[in-house]
UniProtKB/Swiss-Prot annotation:
It comes from Synechococcus elongatus (strain ATCC 33912 / PCC 7942 / FACHB-805). NCBIfam families: dnaG. Its cofactor is Zn(2+); Mg(2+). Mg(2+) 1 binds at residues 271, 317. GO terms for cellular component: cytoplasm; DNA-directed RNA polymerase complex; primosome complex. Belongs to the DnaG primase family. The keyword Electron transport does not apply. It comes from the Bacteria. This is DNA primase. Mg(2+) 2 binds at residues 317, 319.
């Protein structure tokens, strides 16, 4: 039987999931050497380790026989298999769905590939048009802006192919469709023109804007960013998502920066196009920018191909908006950072300036010095938590401690946790040595109690995910379809310390909602809203459903059907939205609480319990004077020896009391909990250890 033609998406998915070390180590004994692995080459009679495997580059190479390639090539050469056979085997191994091409599908794919080439051609011609327009009289103001306001040299303008979109409604449309004879639907597909509502022709998407081409890794133009020159909103307008232009998979400037990233073993990620352009002009050419979105895991992995140490510096603005962008970026790759798979640092420039503004007033050496001193992401986050806090006020002190405990509880490395516990204790004690010692002890105990977060799935029952999915969906439906309750939802989540949603589709939808609201309300108002404060009327006035419907193509990985179009049952439930909301939130919190209980119960059960008899025996061996209060000494020793077990016992019973409180709230709205059985609601763990007592 012939091996079927595989769909390109299947091949791409296999390449993304296949790990070179995982595959090679099954055939070759590998030893760690620096960032790479070495072993005896399987392709020739190797006497000394000349075979190198690079996890960062997903590549192997033998310095003796010259064999080299990616994971697929390794298996093809070793097993003498065809490309398709290896890909099929890997697809089964990594559980990648296999799609194949029939003859007709193969022909359609060839047609699509041909159309892609035409799209590249259209975008290249558009780039030339914008570049030429910059040199014409109508582009004089844009050129003056680049030279005077941005202080760019001619070589930099040409390097980045900067241009100008004329103010006329259809200058580019006329040039491409009528003069260059490109099909109108092709030009529209490239994101350059928009069809008129009356169906009579097209108008230019970009008008009277400074044009910044966005390139892929091969240096081909795939989209544009257009900056207004008149104060018109939005300040920056990007190309829409197209076949070629996917914002989450691209980084502005990477085509020009990748060699420098490999040389410097570091990538600098900034916020704006002109930050990248200014840094490259100053000789700091290992800088890139995300395209108006938080840095994604995929973008981080893209950068990791070029940096052996996977070192990434986030250089975002030092204002609150920049800090929020940095926090979003950290959130996307936090697990990679905790595991040490990426060395993440954060650089905030003084005075709240971006890189472009800073370089206009300071030297390149100043910037490089700040770059070299940029703190690790965890140090930066701790700094953010302590900034502008009055630690003499109990509520602020408690809030800081709780947030820091959550951060440190996720660290898998015990020595590193100890380092940060002592460092934070020193800062919280404000120079008081005795207080620092006590704080370090308290923090260590609290962090130990938080360690279950890193192993969440271990403490989760099989049915928890589906129950949580129902509850989170109900919260989102209330938020979307009951606008008067939006501030109440925000306040409830904030007060319960529920940081967003657990399931990825819900997180993406919540993030999209927040971006829409921030665009309407502004950052300052949105900051209050996220804390459950501010004006609920302004929040309620935003018509989220149609806006989200228009953004369907941008929300990959989210099925919005059940959120935007309500069923009859949904309509019935939402006739009493407030009890529904309270019940759903209580259920989300209950699931978290149950998980904590299971963890604490397990930790408690694993402690060695020392009896009073054991304590008496120890004291007798040590010798007790006649004038000593023996009962007090026995009690003190009992508490000392059982300190850990008593700690977990106390935490466990606190959680059980909280569960009872949540169950009372749950009774307000039974229909929010139809997915929860009586057993789910009561069974926390098989057996509760006996309390430690006399």
């Amino acid at each position: 039987m012939d091996t079927p033609r595989l769909h390109p998406e299947t091949i791409a998915a296999v390449k993304e999931r296949a790990d070179i070390v995982d595959i090679v180590s099954e055939q070759v004994v590998l030893k760690k050497r620096g960032k790479d692995f070495v072993g005896l080459c399987p392709f020739h009679d190797d006497k000394s380790p000349s075979f190198t495997v690079s996890p960062a580059k997903q590549f192997y190479y033998c310095f003796s026989c010259g064999a080299g390639g990616n994971p697929i090539k390794f298996l093809m050469e070793l097993g003498k298999q065809s490309f398709s056979e290896v890909v099929l085997d890997l697809a089964k191994r990594y559980q990648v769905p296999v799609r194949t091409l029939e003859v007709q599908q193969h022909q359609e794919l060839q047609r699509q590939l041909s159309r892609r080439e035409r799209l590249y051609e259209v975008l290249a011609v558009a780039t030339q048009f914008y570049e030429q327009s910059l040199r014409r009289p109508e582009g004089a103001a844009a050129l003056d802006y680049l030279r005077r306001s941005r202080q760019l040299q001619e070589s930099t303008i040409q390097k980045f192919q900067l241009g100008y979109a004329p103010a006329q409604w259809a200058s580019l449309a006329t040039h491409l469709i009528e003069q260059k004879r490109f099909p109108a639907d092709l030009v529209e597909e490239a994101g350059l023109v928009v069809a008129r509502r009356n169906g009579q022709g097209y108008y230019d998407r970009f008008r009277d804007r400074l044009m910044i081409p966005i390139h892929d890794l091969q240096g081909r133009v795939v989209g544009f960013g257009g900056r207004t020159l008149t104060g018109e909103e939005p300040k920056y307008l990007n190309s829409p998502e197209t076949t070629l232009f996917e914002k989450g998979k691209l980084l502005f400037g990477l085509d020009k920066a990748r060699a420098a990233i490999a040389k410097q073993d570091q990538a600098v990620v900034v916020e704006g196009y002109f930050d990248v352009i200014a840094l490259h002009a100053a000789g700091i050419d290992h800088a890139v920018a995300s395209l108006g979105t938080a840095l994604s895991r995929q973008q981080v992995k893209l950068l990791s191909r070029y940096s052996e140490s996977n070192q990434i510096v986030l250089n975002f603005d030092a204002d609150r908006a920049g800090a929020k962008a940095a926090e979003r970026a950290i959130g996307e790759v936090e697990d990679l950072a905790y595991q040490g798979q990426v060395q993440l640092r954060v650089l905030n420039l003084p005075g709240g300036k971006d890189a472009d503004e800073y370089l206009q007033r300071h030297s390149v050496a100043d910037y490089r010095e700040l770059l070299a001193r940029s703190p690790l992401w965890l140090d930066w986050q701790i700094d953010q938590l302590l900034r502008d806090r009055n630690l003499d006020q109990a509520d602020q002190f408690q809030a800081v401690v709780q947030a820091i405990v959550q951060l440190l509880g996720k660290l898998p490395n015990t020595p590193l946790r100890t380092h940060y516990v002592h460092q934070v204790a020193e800062r919280l004690s404000q120079g008081e040595a005795r207080t620092a010692v006590q704080l370090a002890s308290d923090l260590r105990a609290q962090v130990r109690g938080q360690r279950w977060h890193g192993q969440a799935s271990r403490w989760e029952k099989p049915g928890d995910v589906s129950i949580r999915e129902q509850a989170e969906a109900q919260i989102l439906k209330v938020y979307l379809h009951c606008p008067r309750l939006r501030l109440a939802v925000r306040k409830t989540l904030h007060d319960r310390e529920i940081q967003g949603f657990s399931l990825q589709p819900h997180r993406l939808l919540w993030q999209a909602i927040a971006e829409i609201e921030e665009a309407h309300l502004g950052f300052a108002a949105m900051y209050q809203v996220e804390r459950g404060e501010g004006n609920g009327d302004d929040l309620a006035a935003i018509d989220l459903v149609p806006i989200l419907r228009d953004r369907l193509d941008q929300l990959t990985g989210v099925s919005l059907g059940g959120f935007l179009e309500l069923s009859e049952n949904d309509h019935a439930d939402l006739t009493h939205p407030l009890p529904l909301l309270r019940g759903a939130v209580a259920l989300v919190e209950r699931l978290r609480c149950e998980k904590r209980c299971r963890h604490l119960l397990d930790s408690w059960a694993r402690q060695s319990i020392h009896t009073f008899e054991h304590c008496i025996e120890q004291l007798l061996q040590a010798g007790i004077g006649e004038d000593v209060d023996a009962e007090a000494q026995i009690t003190a020793l009992h508490e000392q020896l059982n300190q850990e077990a008593l700690h977990f016992q106390k935490l466990y019973y606190n959680e059980r009391r909280y569960l009872q409180q949540l169950d009372q709230e749950r009774c307000l709205n039974p229909q929010a909990f139809l997915g929860m059985t009586e057993h789910d609601a009561t069974a926390i763990a098989p057996t509760t250890p006996q309390p430690i007592s006399a």
